[in-house]
Swiss-Prot record:
Family: Belongs to the bacterial ribosomal protein bL17 family.
A cellular component annotation (GO) from this entry: cytosolic large ribosomal subunit
Keywords recorded for this protein, A-Z: Ribonucleoprotein, Ribosomal protein
Name this protein carries in UniProt: Large ribosomal subunit protein bL17
InterPro entries named among the record's database cross-references: Ribosomal_bL17, Ribosomal_bL17_CS, Ribosomal_bL17_sf
Gene3D superfamilies associated with the record: Ribosomal protein L17
Gene, per the UniProt record: rplQ
SUPFAM superfamilies the UniProt entry points to: Prokaryotic ribosomal protein L17
Subunit description: Part of the 50S ribosomal subunit. Contacts protein L32.
GO molecular-function terms, A-Z: structural constituent of ribosome
Organism, as annotated: Chelativorans sp. (strain BNC1)
Amino acid sequence: MRHGKAGRKLNRTSSHRKAMFANMAASLIEHEQIVTTLPKAKELRPIVEKLVTLGKRGDLHARRQAIAAIRSETLVRRLFDTLAPRYASRNGGYTRIMKAGFRHGDNAAMAVIEFVDRDPSVKGAADRARVEAEAANEEAEAA
């Protein structure tokens, strides 16, 4: 009997699960919206909600806990400086999960997980900056 055994294993080892959710949380903080399978989105939600709550606390210990969880100081800075103030007046419920049909290859249920009141201009901003930098670099080499 599996009484009291919360959480999905997702057919992965515990270290793989931990790394995967750290990467997914980092991607969600960076892009504010990601597409994944429905079970992964449902498991990711409490992890990200706790990270935003750490950001709202804002002290040094909370910052170090967030760095330990997502392993990226730049994303922790974004979490504490932009996301936490945005949700300062909201008590939980920082993310939303929307069902997004089924994946063609294996018919897995897909979902979009995003921050409530997200900034749409953030999605793809890193890619735009990279493309602009490459174009500027090519122009400099051509000159």
